Amino acid sequence: MPEADLFIAECSDNGLLDWHWHMVAAEKFQLTLTQVERRALDLGIMPKRYQRNQATITVDDQLKLFKSHVAVIGCGGLGCYIVEELARAGIGTITVIDPDVFEEHNLNRQLFSTMANMGSAKVEVAASRVDSINPAVRLIPIQDSFNRANGSSLLHGADIAVDALDNIATRLELSTVCKELAIPFVFGTVAGWYGQVSTLFPGDTLMHTMYPDSTKEHGIEQQLGTPAFTPAVVASIEAVEVCKFLLGKKQLLQGRSLTIDLLAMEVDQIETTA
């Protein structure tokens, strides 16, 4: 066993490695914090930050998540919550794509927006936020608009994409690019009290069934608005779908769409055509 691995094993306590020993190992053996976390998981040692995951997510599962690459398209109402939850879950690489900067009207619902970062690029704020949560997670910030022309390069290497967009045309382009790359994507949308989530695989036609008019830029959210709580709920369900896919769970929202009515407190499933 390499010396670094022996050191990590010796520093663990009841199968857990606390952050202090991450930093010591990184400095002692000239490793990145990402490399230390990966070595610990390879040894079957759970970083202590994930201790409360253990009853649900095993060390092997945690390793799967850490080896995964997720692309989040959009870093607004949905995207901020999705990035936060994926980082805390231990996804090893997260690409975040968004061209915008934070503005005052984002403050009601976008988790990363504060009075102090008005005018700052959303993806750069996301990178700083993730680094403050877990420096072992690699976040790739891309301040650019997603489209059909650049989509394949922006999603390169991703295992799954997550829709956190606010316009229909780009959502349809994302669906097309994911089909070309043969990767699934988790679809989520919010409007007022209402939300919808589904997981689409290459060949699924839900997007084009829902949005037959590909020239329409915005959906009903423009009329109903977006309060603080609806993106938080929908984003959490999207993050769950991502983790279930990466862990090989079969109970995905494929072939069905989850609709959420927070006003009536009702959740329904709608069967969709593949």
What are these regions (language model features)?
Residues 118-153, 169:
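Ligand-binding beta-strand-loop-alpha-helix segment within the catalytic cores
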Residues 1-21, 141, 146-147, 152-153, ...:
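E1/E1-like adenylate-forming module used to activate ubiquitin-like modifiers
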Residues 37-38, 96-134:
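Glycine-rich phosphate-binding loop and adjoining beta1-alpha1-beta2 segment
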Residues 1-70:
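N-terminal charged helix/coil linker that caps or initiates catalytic domains
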Residues 61-98:
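Glycine-rich adenosine-cofactor-binding loop
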Residues 82-83, 126, 174:
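Hydrophobic residues within alpha-helices
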Residues 236-251:
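Oxidoreductase and adenylate-handling cofactor-binding alpha/beta cores
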